């Protein structure tokens, strides 16, 4: 029996864990956070393409997430392509 998780299995396990930690997160929002943390995708189009999700859905979820204080930061918006670059905020020194 192979005990190693595939990259996809690991990603979805982390998404589920993120949702368990914050019940307000949708699966797409949790995916955006995990993708940013793992360096899988740091812009909306890359995330949409890699997961096979419509870019418009990703943009809606990304904007909702960015509206929450301290969860995700919008770095740049490209008005021509609608691509939104994002990052996780720096970890607080608590």
Q: Which positions does each model-derived feature cover?
A:
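Short amphipathic alpha-helical interface segments
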Residues: 25-40, 45, 49
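Short alpha-helical segments that sit at the start of domains
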Residues: 3-31
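Short amphipathic alpha-helical interaction segments
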Residues: 53-68
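Short, cationic-aromatic polyanion-contact patches
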Residues: 18-26, 43, 73-94
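Short loop/turn and capping residues at structural boundaries
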Residues: 46-47, 59, 76-77
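Short, structured secondary-structure boundary patches
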Residues: 3-5, 12, 62, 77-82
């Amino acid at each position: 029996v192979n005990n190693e998780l595939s990259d996809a299995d690991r990603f979805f396990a982390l998404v589920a864990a993120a949702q368990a930690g914050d019940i307000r997160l949708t699966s797409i929002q949790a995916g955006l956070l995990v993708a940013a943390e793992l360096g899988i995708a740091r812009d909306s189009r890359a995330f949409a393409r890699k997961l096979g999700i419509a870019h418009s859905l990703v943009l809606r979820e990304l904007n909702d997430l960015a509206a929450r204080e301290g969860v995700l930061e919008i770095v740049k918006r490209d008005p021509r392509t609608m691509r939104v670059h994002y990052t996780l905020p720096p970890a607080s020194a608590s």
